[in-house]
């Protein structure tokens, strides 16, 4: 969430910055709401002062054993009016918060201006796509041929956009998660967490998924029921990891906080009808290793480069060709002020596909979750900055390995870095 005071103070500048994201701020609405809030705030304060004055008068009269009925009646009328004004103030504040929750984050100055993904900028390429002397097969063809990917049985169980993995491919899927977690905990300084896969509405609001992306989730219960008994399956471990520090004040010397978790992720893929209905690319359920950093504001720019590098190391050690993309203003996610996507090479498609998204949310998520830190120098309390990254999406990484490491016979070579995690296995056939 953007700071309300910042919007009011610099409304023209904020409007211009939000237009870059294809978001048009309703200036009239937000200024009118703020004007109502100010008037009600003043009225409440005046009535509180009147009430306090009446209380003092009543106390003095009591001491002198005089009749206080007239003053009590006056005090009661003030209290009734005060409660009415408080309710109106509460209502207008709620309206302001509701509108603020629909406004995306302000972009970093270095984000390129553009309408959509066509205007994203490639900032780096690593590795070269292999040249094959045989006809390339897709990961679906290879997996089904060796009978280790079963989409027909998964459809029987759950419908489209699911998969049943077995035998050596299931083994590699597990090995990938172990490799990623070991890399991030042993070499990159993250602490591993096991987190709930069901979260309540407040957690999704805190990380910015709600209210904008309401239709993207699978719900265990309707959110129209009691808030504490309503759950959604997590779309990413970013949600529970970030909310671990919700409503907390962290001493500055404990920053940065670096967390990682391997979880299944659940997404309805609303708006993706007909796209990638078969395969490991766009599924309702997939596994991912997530990395999250909570840092002081002055370190968040550096932290984004670091978190992206940590995701890149996974691809480099797997020897998978990829490219690093800086998202333009029109393609940057709702909560993010700056995002890099990592896209891995898919031979059967002859193109790169997204396998990681690394974002700096600045103080957008921390304002919603009230995650703050106390400075060592002056004990002042400020909002933290929060960053997150996929490191990596396991199913898509697996699909890329199957295709990039395929042999003429339709087998799959095991990347060297994964062999120790698979009892030295070198070939899946």
Swiss-Prot record:
Write out the annotated subcellular location. Answer: Cytoplasm
Q: Which gene encodes it?
A: serS
Task performed by this protein: Catalyzes the attachment of serine to tRNA(Ser). Is also able to aminoacylate tRNA(Sec) with serine, to form the misacylated tRNA L-seryl-tRNA(Sec), which will be further converted into selenocysteinyl-tRNA(Sec).
**Disulfide bridge map:** none
What name does this protein carry? Answer: Serine--tRNA ligase
Q: Which InterPro entries match?
A: aa-tRNA-synt_IIb, aa-tRNA-synth_II, aa-tRNA-synth_II/BPL/LPL, Ser-tRNA-ligase_type_1, Ser-tRNA-synth_1_N, SerRS_1_N_sf, SerRS_core, tRNA-bd_arm
A GO molecular function held by the record: serine-tRNA ligase activity
Keyword list (alphabetical) reads: Aminoacyl-tRNA synthetase, ATP-binding, Cytoplasm, Ligase, Nucleotide-binding, Protein biosynthesis
Origin organism of this chain?
A: Wigglesworthia glossinidia brevipalpis
